[in-house]
């Protein structure tokens, strides 16, 4: 029999949500706001932005990002230049999670990572490898949950991102 302590789990989830909310509130100012945003990985979108989510027969909030199917361990790249404002290895819902502030209130998020390769305070460039695709947190298989937000308002990445990230080695 599985022994689940629901109050403890709920307390941990609330604590993690506060960590995420506080990270998203951090202001980051850049004189040279990125003009281009790229997809962080090549892959098929397995769940689009805004999709209705039903879990155990109960309607949930709309999907706040896009899920991109990709092989376990595939490189995840920064969508644009920015500052890492959160790098966590194991959050309950989102597993390995990175948030990057790009200036002007724009933040990108990368979740379910098997490996987080940056730390809080790191400056990254578009195309830098920041993590590896995984199935951590509440995930049913390997994929990247990718989000973009502007001042805490979720934005559909399809309207902002160009093709996949440039190769930083070239």
Name every feature range the model reports, one short phrase each:
Residues 1-44, 48-49:
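Non-catalytic extracellular/periplasmic "stalk"
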């Amino acid at each position: 029999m599985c022994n689940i302590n629901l109050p403890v789990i709920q307390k941990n989830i609330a604590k993690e949500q506060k960590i995420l909310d506080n990270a998203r509130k951090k202001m980051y100012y850049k004189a040279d706001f990125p003009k281009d945003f790229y997809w962080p990985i090549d892959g098929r979108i397995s769940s689009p932005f805004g999709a209705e989510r039903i879990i155990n027969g109960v309607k949930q909030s709309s999907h706040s990002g896009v899920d991109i199917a990709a092989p376990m361990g595939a490189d995840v790249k920064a969508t644009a230049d920015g500052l890492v404002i959160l790098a966590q290895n194991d959050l309950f819902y989102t597993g390995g999670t990175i948030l990057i502030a790009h200036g002007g209130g724009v933040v990108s998020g990368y979740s379910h990572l098997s490996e987080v390769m940056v730390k809080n305070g790191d400056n990254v460039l578009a195309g830098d490898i920041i993590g590896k695709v995984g199935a951590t947190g509440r995930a049913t298989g390997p994929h990247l949950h990718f989000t973009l937000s502007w001042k805490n308002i979720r934005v559909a990445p399809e309207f902002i991102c160009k093709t996949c990230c440039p190769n930083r080695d070239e």
